[in-house]
UniProtKB/Swiss-Prot annotation:
This is Toxin GTx1-15. Residues 22-46 form a propeptide. The primary structure of the mature peptide is identical to that of GpTx-1 from Grammostola porteri (AC P0DL72) and Gtx1-15 from Paraphysa scrofa (AC P0DL73). It is found in: Secreted. The lineage of its organism: Eukaryota, Metazoa, Ecdysozoa, Arthropoda, Chelicerata.
Length: 82
């Protein structure tokens, strides 16, 4: 009787370990799928400047639409009709 109880407890422990390992594997695959779905591309290393930000005219980094680096004021300004 004692040995059968020990075998039942050992079997339950083994089943618990197997289920836990299976769940960990499933969780890692779910995390992998989610990270693939929600993977965002890294922004370019361009350092885009916004409106009225200090800039260098020879190295125009005012990259939003209709923004250019002003040669006189040396900041990004809007140019209409560009």
């Amino acid at each position: 009787m004692k040995t059968s109880v020990v075998f039942v407890i050992a079997g339950l422990a083994l089943l618990s370990v197997a289920c836990y390992a299976s769940e960990l594997k499933e969780q890692s695959s779910i995390n992998e799928v989610l990270s693939t779905i929600f993977h965002f591309e890294q922004p370019e290393e361009r350092d885009c400047l916004g409106f009225m930000r200090k800039c260098i005219p020879d190295n125009d980094k005012c990259c939003r639409p209709n923004l250019v680096c002003s040669r006189t004021h040396k900041w990004c300004k809007y140019v209409f009709g560009k």
